[in-house]
Amino acid sequence: MGHNHNEGANKKVLLISFIMITGYMIIEAIGGFLTNSLALLSDAGHMLSDSISLMVALIAFTLAEKKANHNKTFGYKRFEILAAVINGAALILISLYIIYEAIERFSNPPKVATTGMLTISIIGLVVNLLVAWIMMSGGDTKNNLNIRGAYLHVISDMLGSVGAILAAILIIFFGWGWADPLASIIVAILVLRSGYNVTKDSIHILMEGTPENIDVSDIIRTIEGTEGIQNIHDLHIWSITSGLNALSCHAVVDDQLTISESENILRKIEHELEHKGITHVTIQMETEAHNHDNAILCQPKMEKQRDHHHH
């Protein structure tokens, strides 16, 4: 049940953050145009990607709650990961555009209405601080990729607002017009970094990669070290979505075991694996007589057929 309460809290946090950020983003975009500040516009661009990522995260949560059906036996849990990829890609594109725009401006800094820029960026900082605080106190910023993504966005947004504030102050006091494009580039690099990381982690999950926090050798030792298991092969460990890890393998046991004895062994293994963060476990029990390649990790069928022709 803990899981459900958590999802509800996460959803509420996302909804409140979405409303606050979208509202402020509109103000900041208009402000950026009126004051002619690229730092504000780049921060608004970042806010836009935030607001999209929050919206997608909300849709992902809603979809992930839909039950699995005959057509999608895992349910819609992966949507969250697809959403994270799209979001990451959007961040990368936005940041590259801002860098391009800023380089243009260095050679020819336009006139910026600094007071407006300063006011808007200070409001932005306050909004970001509020949203970050709501996320920290109410959401699961550690384990849930979607909330983590949204939280990282907000944190780098905050840096964006700080950048715009500093740029406005530099222009007001020293007349340094280049401070505006410089602040934009710094924000853009931060955006690029978080976009790259979110995309990389999501693609790893889509490629059925081994979850980050799982040590395969340790898992093999754990299963093979369980009394009654002789060895395992055809092992797969993957993430269905962030925080939901699955494992399947074939385990060789003594052919004299009764079904209830093998159930006991399974229960032990499931218990051990749950402590290591794997909750969805499928183990096929076999005896020595069941002929298989003994590779711990599975080979594709094509290779197996080739091997059989040689025998």
From Swiss-Prot:
Annotated Gene Ontology cellular component terms: plasma membrane
SUPFAM superfamilies: Cation efflux protein cytoplasmic domain-like, Cation efflux protein transmembrane domain-like
Family membership noted in the UniProt record: Belongs to the cation diffusion facilitator (CDF) transporter (TC 2.A.4) family. SLC30A subfamily.
Compartment(s) of residence: Cell membrane
InterPro entries hit by this protein: Cation_efflux, Cation_efflux_CTD, Cation_efflux_CTD_sf, Cation_efflux_TMD_sf, CDF/SLC30A
Keywords, ordered alphabetically: Cadmium, Cell membrane, Cobalt, Cobalt transport, Ion transport, Membrane, Potassium, Potassium transport, Transmembrane, Transmembrane helix, Transport, Zinc, Zinc transport
GO MF terms held by the record: zinc ion transmembrane transporter activity
Residue spans, topological domain Extracellular: 1-12, 65-78, 137-157
Biological processes annotated in GO: cobalt ion transport; potassium ion transport; zinc ion transmembrane transport
Recorded topology in the membrane: Multi-pass membrane protein
Function: Involved in divalent cation and potassium homeostasis in the cell. Catalyzes the active efflux of zinc, cadmium and cobalt, in exchange for potassium and H(+) ions.
Residue intervals on the Cytoplasmic side: 34-43, 100-115, 179-311
Protein name: Cadmium, cobalt and zinc/H(+)-K(+) antiporter
TM region(s), chain numbering: 13-33, 44-64, 79-99, 116-136, 158-178
Description of what induces expression: Repressed by CzrA.
The keyword Transmembrane belongs to this UniProt entry's keyword annotation: yes
The organism's taxonomic lineage, starting at the top: Bacteria, Bacillati, Bacillota, Bacilli, Bacillales
